[in-house]
Structures are given as structure tokens and as C-alpha cells.
């Protein structure tokens, strides 16, 4: 209901007594959606723990936490790039944006958004190596080669419209090396992978928020690299031990991609109130 009402709230400004009132209404409805999701999941799991009959997969706490993790992960993944274009083109004075770079229009910022999604692809390709039944030595070689092959695809695609500079390629290559080190340290352990890349993601967002220039820009872009492996890790940890309820639990997890529709507008409203850079702090808390 709150999602429906939030869409219905988007009416022409002249039909409302105050545009400010409309913005507050949208923010409240979005917060209600967010709180409702968390409350319903916790309530269902709490009730199931007392009397599991009829609750199916929801009686397992790892699934409940996994549902919330998928919700927030997808929300963060979508949010970083959804508002990145606005961050790069918003002029705070003298043709400079909030991270201290020259203001970029949509065409100029498109390659950075593409690079963010490319980072997601790089991480997914690299993470998939663990699914193959190959020797450990070959796996280690592929862990190093695969991300750069994927990056080559990203570079080639951008070359047709807005090519990356040698400097940008070099910086992102160094970030890929950090990701590779993370994979080596985790040693195919889903819990370790999630812990390492969650920490790296938080560090990247902090650098983006409090840094400036290309350092801040590429810190935000690195969010794609570090978010990329979260889905399979959360999924596998959440359905462990569900037995006959594995299929049902998987369905619940997929439903929680709803976070990608709730968290981005919430950050957008926070950006309107506190500023775009400050609004990215919400991603760290999530």
C-alpha cells in the first residue's frame, strides 16, 4: 500500500498546496516502506521461532537475515550509480561539482556509470571461477587473468562512444588488483568473501564522501567491484540448512530485490535535504 501511495503522490505541483509538503510526504512513505519490510521479516521469523508450523522457510533465522541482506545489498548497488550522474553534474559554484571535479553533463558522465556496472561484471566473472571443478593452481591463475579480460571488454565497449583515458584505465586496474587480493584472502569461503568486500565497500564509500577529485570519483566507482560478489555469497549462506524449504527460501530471497526500488528514492530525498555527498552516508549505515 505504501509503495502504491508513493507513486500516487507524484502529481503536478500546482494541484498541491505546497511542493515542500509533497516532498515530505514522499520521504515519509519511502521510510514507511523501508521500516515495514524490516518489521515484517523480523515479525515473521519471531513468530516462526515460537511456533514453526505453517511458516515454512521463514522459521530459519539465516533466511530472515539473508532476506534483509539482499534487500539492502540490491538497494545499495542500484543507489550508488542512480545518483552518481547527478553528483557529477551538480554545480556547487565556479563550474565545480561536489567532489571537486569540473561539472560533467550526462554524456560525459555516462562512461563512469558504465564503468561502475562494468565493475559489477568484472566481480561476477571472477567470482564464478569457484563454481568450476578445476585445480587450485589453475584457479589461482584464472583469478588474476579473468578480471582483466572482463575489464578489456568494458574498455572496448566504451571505446566506441566515450573512451577511458590511460590514466583512468591505470587507476581502475589498481582497484581490480585490490579485488583480486580480496579473493585470494577469502579462499572461496562465502562468509569471508562477504566480510572482506563489505569492509572494502564501506572504506570506498568513506573515501568517496570525504575525499575529492579523481580519488573520490573512483572510490564511488569501486562500489561496483566490491558489491559484485555479494549476491551469490548472501544467497548461499541464507539457504544453507533449509532442506526441503530451499526452493521456498530462494523465492523469498529473490522477492527482496525490492530494495532496489525503495532505497534509491530514499537517498534521493536525503540528497534534497542534506546534499548529495552527505546522502551517501546512508549507504554506509545500510
Task: Go through the PLM ranges and name each one.
Residues 1-5, 284-286:
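Conserved small/polar residues in nucleotide/adenosyl-binding loops
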Residues 6-11, 61-113:
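Extracytoplasmic gate region of multi-pass secondary transporters
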Residues 95-116, 144, 165-168, 247-251:
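Loop-to-transmembrane helix entry
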Residues 123-137, 181-189:
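Helix-to-loop junctions at the C-terminal end of transmembrane segments
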Residues 244-271:
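A late C-terminal transmembrane helix in Major Facilitator Superfamily
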Amino acid at each position: 500500500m505504501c509503495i502504491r501511495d508513493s507513486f500516487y503522490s507524484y502529481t503536478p505541483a500546482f494541484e498541491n498546496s505546497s511542493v515542500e509538503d509533497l516532498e515530505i510526504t514522499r520521504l515519509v512513505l519511502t521510510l514507511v516502506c523501508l521500516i515495514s519490510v524490516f518489521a515484517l521479516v523480523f515479525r515473521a521469523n519471531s513468530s516462526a521461532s515460537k511456533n514453526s508450523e505453517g511458516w515454512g522457510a521463514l522459521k530459519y533465522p539465516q533466511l530472515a537475515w539473508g532476506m534483509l541482506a539482499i534487500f539492502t545489498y540490491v538497494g545499495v548497488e542500484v543507489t550508488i550509480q542512480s545518483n552518481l550522474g547527478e553528483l557529477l553534474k551538480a554545480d556547487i559554484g565556479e563550474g565545480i561539482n561536489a567532489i571537486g571535479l569540473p561539472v560533467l553533463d550526462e554524456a560525459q558522465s555516462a562512461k563512469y556509470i558504465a564503468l561502475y556496472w562494468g565493475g559489477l561484471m568484472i566481480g561476477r566473472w571472477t567470482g564464478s571461477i569457484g563454481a568450476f571443478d578445476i585445480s587450485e593452481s589453475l584457479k589461482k591463475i584464472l583469478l588474476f587473468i579473468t578480471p582483466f579480460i572482463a575489464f578489456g571488454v568494458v574498455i572496448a565497449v566504451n571505446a566506441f562512444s566515450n573512451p577511458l583515458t590511460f590514466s583512468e584505465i591505470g587507476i581502475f586496474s589498481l582497484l581490480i588488483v585490490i579485488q583480486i587480493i580480496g579473493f585470494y584472502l577469502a579462499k572461496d569461503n562465502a562468509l569471508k568473501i562477504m566480510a572482506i568486500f563489505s569492509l572494502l565497500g564501506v572504506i570506498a564509500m568513506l573515501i568517496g564522501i570525504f575525499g575529492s577529485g579523481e580519488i573520490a570519483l573512483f572510490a564511488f566507482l569501486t562500489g561496483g567491484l566490491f558489491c559484485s560478489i555479494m549476491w551469490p555469497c548472501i544467497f548461499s549462506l541464507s539457504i544453507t540448512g533449509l532442506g526441503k524449504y530451499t526452493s521456498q527460501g530462494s523465492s523469498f530471497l529473490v522477492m527482496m530485490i525490492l530494495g532496489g526500488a525503495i532505497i534509491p528514492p530514499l537517498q534521493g530525498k536525503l540528497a534534497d535535504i542534506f546534499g548529495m555527498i552527505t546522502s551517501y552516508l546512508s549507504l554506509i549505515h545500510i
